[in-house]
């Protein structure tokens, strides 16, 4: 029963309230901060549970009043109050169920986004640039900071590959649903016959990983330095500031040339490498989970075709939830929350289903 779990959480919260006020625990700052975070996480659930108990008590009190009331006008007023309280109680039950869902420990983290032009040549590279702009605009709307890590540009303004970081609270919780294959259908500027072409770009969204989460031994990496290049491969730097890091055990390769400093490029490349190794470890972990326990909303497979952008129809369709919006222009300007929120809702519904007994 959910009520048993809520009572346990409430007792745990009360215990933590005492602990974080204990001077002996406060002396150990690391332990104290850990307990404070746990206390803050539980506080949201406890406060919602208090609201639920108050609504339940009010509802029962009104039902008792109704059974004793004979005046018709008063009965109508009480019935109206009962109706409102019943609806409020149901809303609180739904909110509590969502709060009790297992938390993704990466949700509050910054993210690395990798976009690669897939099938379609120059047109795919141009679409990759469109996606880069879309995510940049979305980050701006959320007041998140965008930091370019590396880019392999084409002569006509597209990207064979672009890797960038988005820093901001909750960035991963929203953008993790963007991992997968994105398909575009449109008439290229170079197409004289007006024929619609289909191209793809793949997106990978990786949470930023702390040094302590993924440890990389120096003996496991090979570092090469080279001169940074710009559009078409021309040299834009006279020093060997660009860095390529190869992780020997996994074969993963990361390059960074955005900074003028070799040291900064190395730091950035190591961050991306850590994120990729973490993603690899997570994929292996999830592969060991029974299929029926996995969320039905894709949040990680780069090969999964997740969305189609149809320019002639002004349409964007997310295939995971069969949702279509006829607002492609605004979507590409970063107005992507309508689909992201729908994906989050579907993900929550699947997780609640996996939880089994959700009776109060």
Curated annotation (Swiss-Prot):
Instruction: Give the CC-aspect GO terms.
Output: cytoplasm
UniProt entry keywords in alphabetical sequence: Cytoplasm, Methylation, Protein biosynthesis
SMART domains named among the record's database cross-references: PCRF
Asked whether the UniProt record includes Phosphoprotein among its keywords, one would answer no
PTM N5-methylglutamine: at which residues? 234
A Gene Ontology MF term for this entry? translation release factor activity, codon specific
Protein task: Peptide chain release factor 1 directs the termination of translation in response to the peptide chain termination codons UAG and UAA.
Organism the protein comes from: Clostridium perfringens (strain 13 / Type A)
Per UniProt, subcellular location reads as: Cytoplasm
Q: Which PANTHER family match?
A: LD18447P (PTHR43804:SF7)
Family, according to the entry, reads as follows: Belongs to the prokaryotic/mitochondrial release factor family.
Q: What is this protein called?
A: Peptide chain release factor 1
Please give the chief subcellular localization of this protein. Answer: cytoplasm
Q: Which NCBIfam families match?
A: prfA, PRK00591.1
């Amino acid at each position: 029963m959910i009520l048993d779990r809520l009572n346990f959480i409430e007792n745990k919260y009360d215990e933590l309230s005492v602990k974080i006020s204990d001077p002996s625990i406060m002396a150990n700052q690391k332990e104290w901060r850990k307990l404070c975070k746990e206390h803050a996480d539980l506080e949201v659930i406890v406060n919602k549970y208090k609201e639920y108990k108050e609504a339940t008590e009010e509802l029962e009190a009104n039902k008792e009043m109704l059974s004793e009331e004979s005046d018709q006008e008063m009965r109508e007023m009480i019935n109206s109050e009962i109706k409102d309280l019943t609806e409020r109680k149901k809303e609180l039950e739904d909110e509590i169920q969502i709060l009790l869902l297992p938390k993704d420990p990466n949700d509050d983290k910054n993210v690395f986004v990798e976009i690669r032009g897939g099938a379609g040549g120059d047109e795919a590279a141009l679409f990759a640039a469109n996606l880069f702009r879309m995510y940049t605009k979305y980050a701006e709307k959320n007041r998140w900071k965008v930091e370019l890590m590396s880019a392999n540009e084409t002569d006509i303004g597209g990207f064979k590959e672009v890797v960038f970081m988005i820093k901001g609270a909750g960035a991963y919780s929203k953008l993790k649903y963007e991992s997968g294959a994105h398909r575009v259908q449109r008439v290229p500027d170079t197409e004289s016959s007006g024929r619609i072409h289909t191209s793809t770009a793949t997106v990978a969204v990786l949470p930023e990983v702390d040094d302590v989460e993924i440890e990389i031994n120096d003996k496991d990496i090979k570092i090469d330095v080279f001169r940074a290049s710009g559009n078409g491969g021309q040299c834009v730097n006279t020093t060997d500031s660009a860095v390529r890091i190869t992780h020997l055990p996994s074969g993963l390769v990361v390059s960074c040339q955005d900074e003028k400093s070799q040291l900064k490029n190395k730091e950035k490349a190591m961050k991306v490498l850590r994120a990729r190794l973490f993603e690899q470890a997570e994929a292996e972990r999830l592969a060991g989970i029974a299929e029926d326990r996995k969320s039905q909303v894709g949040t990680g497979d780069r090969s999964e075709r997740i969305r189609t952008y149809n320019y002639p129809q002004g349409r964007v369709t997310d295939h995971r939830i069969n949702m279509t919006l006829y607002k492609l222009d605004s979507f590409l300007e970063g107005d992507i929350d309508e689909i992201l929120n729908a994906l989050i809702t579907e993900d929550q519904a699947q997780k609640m289903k996996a939880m089994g007994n959700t009776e109060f």
